[in-house]
A protein has these predicted regions:
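Short active-site oxyanion
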Residues: 30-36, 109-113, 161-162
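Short, hinge-like loop/turn segments at secondary-structure boundaries
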Residues: 53-56, 75-77, 101-104, 128-133, ...
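Class I SAM-dependent methyltransferase SAM-binding "motif I" and its flanking Rossmann-like core
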Residues: 100-158
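A contiguous loop/helix-start segment that scaffolds small-molecule binding in enzyme catalytic cores
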Residues: 82, 161, 165-281
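Glycine-rich, highly charged phosphate/nucleotide-binding loops
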Residues: 65-73
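A glycine-rich beta-strand to alpha-helix segment
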Residues: 78-123, 169-173
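Conserved helicase motor
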Residues: 61-66, 141-142
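Glycine-rich, flexible N-terminal cofactor/catalytic loop recognition
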Residues: 4-62
């Protein structure tokens, strides 16, 4: 029996590919809610139809939602209605909309109730074969040179598994970037987790990149990338920050020379690394 108290707000994970991963508690909670707050109506209606939940009132909350939308949800809770949040797939707030809403509700004394459930982040991690004692989630692999430099500063943390997402149309370019900058790292690409065509590719970046080049069908689907580098791998974190500071002031070659002088990084490797930042703005 679930006790629905006044001013409770539920965070409800949904399957990332296999409907059987929806928990019994999640289904019961969805059934009992007065209003289900969703990222997109179309995808959530498909889920509701599959789990045989009919006539459920739905509200949209996504990246375009405003402070007025958050206030509207709080007003509904104050009126005694019970609400819960789902994303299109997986656990809400993990690379999905919702942080501002949850923070706002907490600040207004709403009891936020998290339900455990599916997420591609830990699903990929536990089957990766990479260390699980320390890990970080970095969202999506960045597109711009400036954002890549900051992202690589995070990847340069030693002895920690980094987890991030990539889309089908950018996966090969991202693997090329990783191979160029971290050829000795350990890499796992998890494709279509929990779905029929689930697949794990494990090894050095060059090996995995070659597999994608040989089989174009690999590039379709959704990807979780898991990355690990140990103490023996050259640290470019300070060089990346230097590039971020000087990229609009000095030629790339000059920044690479300065990096070698300041941080003892190999000048040629640093130069190639900076080129990869610049050519994929």
């Amino acid at each position: 029996k679930i006790d629905f108290l006044h001013m409770n707000f539920y965070i409800i994970p949904t399957p990332i590919g296999n409907l059987n991963d929806l928990t019994k508690r999640a289904k019961i909670t969805i059934e009992k809610l007065d209003i289900l707050i969703v990222e997109s109506k179309q995808k959530s209606r498909i889920l509701l139809e599959k789990i045989n939940v009919k006539d459920k009132k739905i509200m949209i909350y996504n990246d375009s939602s405003s402070a007025n939308n958050r206030k509207g949800i709080l007003d509904i809770l104050k009126a005694g209605k019970v609400c819960g949040l789902v994303s299109d797939a997986g656990t809400p707030l993990l690379s999905d909309p919702g942080f501002k809403l949850i923070r706002y509700l907490i600040d207004n004394y709403v009891n936020v109730v998290p339900l455990p459930g599916p997420t591609s982040i830990t699903t990929g991690l536990i089957a990766s074969g990479l260390p699980t004692d320390k890990f970080q989630f970095l969202g999506f692999f960045p597109k711009t040179a400036k954002d890549k430099a900051s992202f690589y500063s995070e990847l340069n943390r030693k002895n920690i598994t980094s987890i991030f997402f990539e889309s089908s149309h950018r996966i090969q370019k991202t693997l090329e970037d990783i191979f160029l900058n971290y050829p000795n790292s350990e890499l796992v690409v998890a494709k279509e987790l929990t779905k029929i065509h689930e697949k794990f590719l494990r090894g050095k970046p060059e090996k995995i990149l070659n597999e994608f080049k040989l089989d174009k069908n690999l590039s379709s689907g959704e990807f979780v990338i898991l990355f690990y580098k140990d103490d023996a791998v050259e640290d470019f974190s300070k060089a990346d920050l230097l590039f971020n500071l000087l990229r609009n002031k000095l030629p790339i070659k000059e920044i690479a020379k300065l990096s070698e002088k300041l941080f003892k990084n190999n000048k040629n490797k640093t130069y190639k690394r900076y080129l990869s930042f610049s050519k994929r703005n």
